From Swiss-Prot:
The keyword Lyase applies. It catalyses: (2R,3S)-3-isopropylmalate = (2S)-2-isopropylmalate. PROSITE patterns: ACONITASE_2. Pathway: Amino-acid biosynthesis; L-leucine biosynthesis; L-leucine from 3-methyl-2-oxobutanoate: step 2/4. The gene is leuC. It comes from Bacteroides fragilis (strain ATCC 25285 / DSM 2151 / CCUG 4856 / JCM 11019 / LMG 10263 / NCTC 9343 / Onslow / VPI 2553 / EN-2). This is 3-isopropylmalate dehydratase large subunit. Its EC number is 4.2.1.33. Heterodimer of LeuC and LeuD. One of its GO terms (molecular function) is metal ion binding. InterPro entries: 3-IsopropMal_deHydase_lsu, Acnase/IPM_dHydase_lsu_aba_1/3, Acoase/IPM_deHydtase_lsu_aba, Aconitase_4Fe-4S_BS, Aconitase_4Fe-4S_dom, IPM_dehydratase_rel_enz, IPMI_cat. GO terms for biological process: L-leucine biosynthetic process. HAMAP family: LeuC_type1. Binds 1 [4Fe-4S] cluster per subunit. [4Fe-4S] cluster binds at C345, C405, C408.
Amino acid sequence: MNTLFDKIWDAHVVTTVEDGPTQLYIDRLYCHEVTSPQAFAGLRARGIKVFRPEKVYCMPDHNTPTHDQDKPIEDPVSKTQVDTLTKNAADFGLTHYGMMDKRNGIIHVVGPERGLTLPGMTIVCGDSHTSTHGAMGAVAFGIGTSEVEMVLASQCILQSRPKTMRITVDGKLGKGVTAKDIALYMMSKMTTSGATGYFVEYAGEAIRSLTMEGRLTLCNLSIEMGARGGMIAPDEVTFEYIKGRENAPQGEEWDQAVQYWKTLKSEDDAVFDKEVHFDAADIEPMITYGTNPGMGMGITQHIPTTDGMNETTKASFLKSLDYMGFQPGEALLGKKIDYVFLGACTNGRIEDFRAFASIVKGHQKAEHVIAWLVPGSWMVDAQIREEGLDKILEDAGFAIRQPGCSACLAMNDDKIPAGKYSVSTSNRNFEGRQGPGARTLLASPLVAAAAAITGVIADPRELM
């Protein structure tokens, strides 16, 4: 009867308060520079040590510049936050992957690629996109700063048990359709609140066909549907990805781990609180047109009209389109764009750079387009160079920047100017997310690449 979520959650319950929260043991805490300073300050004020320092990994990513990382950070706020994390990690005896450390990168890219995120774990971080790690078959979710302090002090957290939802995507994915498109399609149908209160398990033939990188992308976007987290049962794809990585089990321990991981799946008779089904054949390359990730459509489609909308929905819809400079019923194909961003914890992995390179190879970047290609980690950067993707990208007029969160959010130097259109592989298109007045169009690396070389919104299938 147990779901995958139930198995992992129940294995980590320390105690349950009647009609209250569960005390849940946490296997891994990730800390970055933005949401951790007050947590460490709280420990200092109480004279508390970190309970299990070996379970905590720290790295800056949000504020790190994507150029000249060997020089002091110019922005004083960013410098303070990055320096504070360095000091806190040193003071409390925590593992810290600082800027220019070849293990550094975006926390949700580094965790899986370093073998720090493993099936069956409970994982938290003061960051909403912690759901990414669920792709490995873990229960992973974002927490607030006061909860970060709680985990640092006790290695436990108080949480109410969420409901469970299974989203099944049956059938085979079409040409040019990626995990990013699956996620944007789901949100366009379910809205950004469609999974609120649920922990989602993704299943079905289309999900199983995804690479590990694709699964990480899909689970990353779970939070944008309102879900507490997302997860995929581990299988041979997962095991092959983990095997031999820096912190992965070795030798006999590996064999024992895989034996256990194979039990981490929902039973055939498992009951979910809600079941949702989609057909892979209905999904095409997607793009957003509004100011939340649920305002997406197939790239060949038209922006919806206001027909049938109530006044409240209509007002919100039109306000969003006004910000974007679009009209109801308008097509986006052929629309001129200004910026392209490849990166973020959503699409900053090696597979994403391979996809982007496959489209731009033999072409040239459109002259007016400014493109920021930002690896999610130094490991991804090294892979790009090992595979010769840097040569393909540079020949096409693109430069590769240094790792970091970059233009996903306006917390560093990489900001989109007001009124400019950015085709972005990141996860949020809220007003001002990429910079005050910036207009963000969320898409896959394939769609971003097509826009980068044509200078307009284009269907990547025509370039494949």
